[in-house]
Amino acid sequence: FGNPFAYTVDPLWPVDLRQPNLQLPWSSDETWYYTGGPHGGWAAGSAWAALDFAPPSDQLGCVQSESWVTAMADGIVTRSDFGAVVVDLDLPGQPADGFAGTGWAITYMHLETRDRIAAGTPVQTGDRLGHPSCEGGFSNGTHLHVARTYNGRWVAADGAVAFNMAGWLSQGLGSEYDGLLVRGTISREACVCRDEINAISP
């Protein structure tokens, strides 16, 4: 297998790590709902890298949605299966190499098979990736689970490099799934509901 140390990335995280500009992962003419604060990026025990959002709907549970999940930044789709779409980000000075384990990548979970973008597809900010659903992992309601990785490691949504989507900054409240999104003087709290308290607009 050769020398494993020849493949190391040092440092794994630079001390001045900054998140690239990310947009909200849905159309600019829609309001979605913040239903889950910082929680495991991938199953129980993983870093609290993920946030959850539900599309606009009058229905509850696992129902088909015509809303689209859209790319938060330019990149290349490296995975599209089992409800997951992973996009390796294309950044100035750090172009996408097609590997989610290097640089920044975004994982979008619970995307329906119908209309889901294919692996290998280049995307630009705002391009359609698929529809939110209950596919891929446990879910009892149609939603999007979104998380960031850097060099293959989950980046905590409320850590030193807080999740920032179009100026909405993630703040944890100490318990899994509890959290705020704050933009300027506006604050929204995670809630398993669709209400003004958790409504997020571009």
Regions found by a protein language model. Name each.
Residues 36-39, 53-56, 73-74, 80-81, ...:
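Active-site-proximal beta-strand/loop segments in catalytic clefts of secreted hydrolases
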Residues 19-21, 29, 46-50, 72, ...:
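Extracytoplasmic
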Residues 44-61, 93-99, 104-106, 111-112, ...:
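Small beta-barrel nucleic-acid-binding modules, principally OB-folds
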Residues 34, 69-71, 75-77, 120-132:
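A structural signal for short beta-strand/turn segments enriched in small hydrophobics and glycine
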Residues 1-11, 15-22, 63, 70, ...:
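Acidic, glycine-rich catalytic/binding loops that coordinate metals and/or anionic ligands
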Residues 42-45, 78, 136-140:
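Short glycine/serine/proline-enriched coil/turn segments at secondary-structure junctions
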Residues 64-116, 140-143:
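Zn2+-dependent peptidoglycan hydrolase active-site motif and core
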Residues 32-73:
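Short glycine/threonine/proline-enriched tight-turn/helix- or strand-capping micro-motif at secondary-structure
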